[in-house]
């Protein structure tokens, strides 16, 4: 029977996970204290007094800034004291509750990330989160799915690459995709399985050393014809979830979760180097109001990736290999 094997929150978007033995979730609310802080890029217009959710490109994050994984951070969520270490050596201790501590973190991150020419701006969500998706979603990873692709690719994959809140074990590989649109219970909590999780370039970063040593989205596309791994949940009840809790899953028929080979887009396609969104000139982009047949060069320069919000310059011509 599937069982909860790990619970994690990420107090600061892009920085280290913090493991938990149990957590109390609330109906319709995000995972508690997860991504409540974020570092807005200096060229963005995020309102620091009342920051609202924005696409990931507005923030310092692993998709663009792999150096974040070179350090290990921990936030005491009762006191907001934060420590930053590298190779177990304490580099900095600060207090996120006061301005001097916030400025110290901003300065540290600016020095850590070569692409930042100014300090980022630390922001705190007042009643939400800074996850990649706007809804109050909770992410789940099935460890058996990761083991399956490890064998297929002959690669060792640290599950923390996927930065999920809930990790489960003993479920059939890919069976989590069958649960979309249905309810599951985890311990005493009930969750609606909202959607599959489309992966971005953040998963290419090794959380142990900050190196980009795998191409997770590209490999998923080549192997299975999609770049999805894991699912998003919505809490439907107020309850405690603990490591060791059993996961009751719906009785669903087996579905085809992967194509045997990747169906390559048309020759006139362009891919976002961050999130791996593909713009196919033949298809256009309905989300952005771009009609089928519109050439990439004809799209206005101010156009942003509909998935991650990166600018048009982040795209390059798509090639399968």
Regions found by a protein language model. Give the residues of each.
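Short, non-ligating residues that shape and space the ligands of small metal-coordination modules
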Residues: 281-282, 313-317
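Short cysteine-rich clusters marking metal-coordination/redox-active sites
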Residues: 272-275, 305-308
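Detector for the N-terminal beta1/A-loop initiation region of ABC nucleotide-binding domains
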Residues: 278
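Short linker/helix segments within small regulatory modules
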Residues: 287-302
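Metal-cofactor-dependent catalytic cores
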Residues: 1-271, 282-285, 321
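A generic structural signal for ordered secondary structure
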Residues: 181, 289, 306-314
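Compact Cys/His-rich metal-coordination microdomains
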Residues: 302-303, 316
């Amino acid at each position: 029977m599937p069982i909860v094997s790990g619970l994690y929150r990420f107090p600061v978007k892009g920085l280290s996970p913090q493991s938990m033995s149990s957590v109390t979730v609330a109906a319709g609310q995000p995972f508690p204290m997860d991504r409540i802080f974020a570092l807005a890029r200096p060229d963005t217009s995020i309102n620091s007094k009342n920051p609202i959710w924005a696409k990931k490109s507005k923030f310092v994050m692993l998709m663009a800034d792999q150096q974040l994984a070179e350090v290990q951070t921990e936030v005491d969520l009762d006191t907001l004291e934060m420590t930053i270490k590298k190779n177990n050596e304490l580099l900095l201790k600060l207090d996120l509750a006061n301005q001097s501590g916030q400025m110290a973190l901003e300065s540290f991150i600016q020095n850590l990330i070569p692409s930042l020419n100014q300090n980022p701006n630390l922001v705190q969500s007042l009643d939400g989160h800074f996850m990649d998706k706007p809804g109050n979603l909770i992410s789940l990873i099935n460890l058996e799915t990761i083991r399956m692709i490890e064998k297929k690719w002959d690669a060792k994959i640290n599950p923390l690459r996927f930065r999920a809140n809930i990790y489960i074990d003993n479920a059939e590989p890919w069976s989590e995709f069958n649960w979309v649109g249905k309810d599951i219970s985890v311990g005493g909590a009930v969750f609606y399985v909202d959607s599959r999780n489309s992966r971005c370039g953040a998963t290419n970063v090794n959380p142990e050393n900050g190196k980009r040593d795998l191409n997770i989205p590209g490999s998923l596309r080549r192997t299975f014809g999609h770049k999805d791994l894991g699912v998003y949940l919505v809490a439907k009840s107020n309850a405690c979830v603990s490591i060791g809790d059993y996961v009751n899953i719906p009785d669903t028929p087996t579905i085809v979760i992967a194509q045997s080979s990747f169906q390559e887009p048309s020759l006139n396609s362009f891919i976002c180097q961050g999130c791996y969104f593909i713009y196919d000139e033949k298809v256009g982009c309905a989300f952005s109001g771009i009609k089928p047949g519109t050439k990439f060069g004809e799209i206005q320069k101010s156009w942003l990736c509909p998935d991650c919000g990166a600018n048009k310059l982040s795209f390059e011509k798509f090639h399968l290999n």
